[in-house]
Amino acid sequence: MQLLGYETGALAFSTQAESGEHERWADEEPKPEHSKSLTGARGSAYSRDPGSMIPAILEKMRPRWGLAASLFLLVLDGSGVGRAAEPNMIGQYRARRIALRKSLDDGITVLFGHREEDGDLRTGFFQESNFYYLTGWQEPGAILLLAPLPDDSHAPGYAARAKLPREILFLPERNPEREKWTGRKIGPEDDNVGKVTGFETVMPAEKFETELHDMLQAYARIYTLTEQSAAARLKLLEPLREISNAASAIAKLRMSKSSEEIALIQRATDVTLDGHRAAWQRAAPGLYEYQIAATMTEIFAESGCERNAYSPIVGSGPNSVYLHYSRNSRRMDAGEVLLMDVAAECSGYASDITRTIPVGGKFTARQKEIYEIVLGAQNAAIAAVKPGMTLSKSAPNSLYKVAYDYINSHGKDLHGERLGKYFTHGLGHHVGLDVHDASDPSAPLEAGMVITVEPGIYIPEENIGVRIEDVVLVTGQGAKVLSAGLPRDPGEIEKLLGTAAPARH
């Protein structure tokens, strides 16, 4: 699944892993024309751009408060319902914050959670993933303020810095009238707020302005996520100084997965495989693509996964050649291929699996030829996965090149040309809290990283699109395929499809 897009809650700034509803293949610039909705994932559909909501009072406050006024006003209207940080993960969230504070040791860090769209009953609220990664907090309107780890007591300004809180979580105060609609949420005034958040210092969001001002007396630099949209970005950044981007530091932490994170990704993957198996059993001529998508989504929910990791991509026949086809509205016919790029999200962590099967139970000779080339490319790339390799297209140690070279040296199109030109996207991406998780595609792989390996060939002239995608854990010795339980061999696929249920109309 090669798409990503959501606005971050950190001033609605976007990072490399959060490209504002633009597809981002490894090593390439965003491509808005390929952007797709992330219904069911953390997306811009779930938050408003704070930059479009700056009131006129901002200009009056700037002379006194500067950055504090600018940032504070962006989150005052946060409200809604969420849930507390997972108790068994609180220590891990704290360890992540400590690691970030150690990395960004010359300034304070300010991050904002998402805010809830008033009256939005279609999607609900989903937390900004960087904020969730560091806090585990699931309610809207929160702010995180971090100071560096304690420094040398002999360093200049130590006395002033030592008096400041090191970690503050700001929460909106409860609104009883709003809670009549949204349900009860947790406010800074609640007696157990420290226990449920895992923070020693929790304050009302209204105090963020003052606390930030106090910290600015001791630290000159502020880290946040610094890419904001449109004119509001200029209004905010013009009067500010010493603003640095925290995106790369956070992405570096998120790229390496803990054992708990790997277990959650494995859980999402196992459920995803169950969904694919159910879809295979149902797929038959006469059904509609959306019925296949619904079958998988039902399995995800019944298995305890809260949502799809992204909008299902279920393309049959001519629709199989479109990378991010999501209309899912066509009636399937016998003799076509059906490409299903669908996955679950469980406990906040995504999987990302694609399989291509024949509608009617048997590949044609040409479909099987193309399928086996893609499978060979994927096998070659997975065999090459090890620490030190990259997902970048241009690096000498590129996994993409392994897959591309295989495709380009096997088979031809109807005009006798090589097939490499039909492999039109990157090989893969990192997976985690986001289906396209925060990462640096040029960085060498390390043990503990989780990536996808997903070569594909898409030939519009033949109405054949084939992609095979698996989730892979990088180990010290090579790779462990977390999705190995779902067949890829065309013979095994055909055997399983032989028991497919008849079409239901």
Give names to the regions the model predicted.
Residues 15, 74-75:
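Generic detector of N-terminal low-structure segments
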Residues 75-82:
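C-terminal segment of classical bacterial N-terminal signal peptides
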Residues 67-73:
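Sec-dependent N-terminal signal peptides
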Residues 21, 46-53, 57:
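Short, positively charged and aromatic/hydrophobic N-terminal segments
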Residues 57-65, 82-505:
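Active-site neighborhoods and metal-handling regions in enzymes and metal-associated proteins
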Residues 24, 42, 48, 62-64, ...:
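Basic polycationic patches enriched in arginine
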Residues 1-18, 25-26, 33, 37-39, ...:
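Short, strongly patterned local motifs
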